[in-house]
């Protein structure tokens, strides 16, 4: 038995927007995972988790990364918050962007975020399910688990959140 329908009709009086993390260095998940590079999926979900804790936010879509063995350079989500929170979300993104630019100043000199107004989604993921999804993705470890004891500098075990995709509803 399934979990039921997690989608609901678009809410009215909401600001629909896309938010993206772009310009990251990326790299191979085996060769570059120990270089301190940012993961676009993790950065995006970190921001969305903060928004969901602060505002009644709906998630419409999420998409990041393309290859199973690459550190993702870009990620994007389509969300909605009450119209009254529109400017606060923009301010929050500016603050968050400054934080992550500082955090990854050495490894991600071209990091940028974008927020754009969008047309309303036909359907949104309900807030409870979206919150659980964001928390689950946020909790996924990304990085080195263990280095080789025999070969200096060799990553032995690691985890890379390479791709976050939302399947079509059919």
What does each model-identified segment do?
Residues 21, 79-83:
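Short beta-strand-to-loop capping motifs
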Residues 27-30, 59, 63-72:
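A structural signal for small-residue-enriched, beta-sheet-centric alpha/beta enzyme cores
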Residues 154-170:
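Substrate-recognition/cap regions that form aromatic- and gly/pro-loop-enriched pockets
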Residues 11-32:
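Residues forming anionic-ligand binding surfaces in small-molecule and nucleic-acid pockets
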Residues 17-19, 77, 113, 170:
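Hydrophobic residues positioned within well-ordered beta-strands of beta-sheet architectures
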Residues 2-7:
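Short, small-residue-biased leader/transition segments that mark boundaries at the very start
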Residues 11-12, 33-63, 82-158:
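Acidic-enriched catalytic cores of C-N bond-cleaving enzymes acting on peptides and small amides
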Residues 70-75, 169:
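A short, glycine/Asx- and small/polar-enriched loop/turn
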């Amino acid at each position: 038995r399934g979990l039921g329908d997690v989608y609901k009709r678009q809410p009215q009086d909401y600001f629909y927007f896309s938010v993206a993390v772009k310009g990251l260095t990326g790299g191979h998940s085996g060769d570059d995972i120990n270089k301190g590079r940012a993961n676009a999926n993790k950065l995006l979900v970190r921001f969305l988790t903060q928004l969901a804790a602060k505002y009644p936010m709906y998630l419409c879509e999420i998409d990041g990364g393309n290859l199973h063995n690459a550190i993702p350079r870009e990620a994007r989500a389509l969300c909605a918050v009450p119209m009254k929170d529109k400017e606060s979300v923009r301010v929050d993104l500016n603050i968050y962007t400054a934080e992550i630019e500082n955090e990854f100043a050495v490894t991600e000199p071209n990091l940028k975020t974008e927020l754009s107004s969008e047309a309303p989604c036909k359907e949104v993921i309900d807030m409870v399910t979206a919150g659980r999804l964001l928390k689950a993705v946020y909790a996924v470890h990304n990085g080195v688990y263990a280095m080789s004891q025999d070969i200096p500098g060799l990553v032995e075990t690691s985890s890379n959140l390479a791709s976050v995709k939302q399947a079509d509803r059919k």
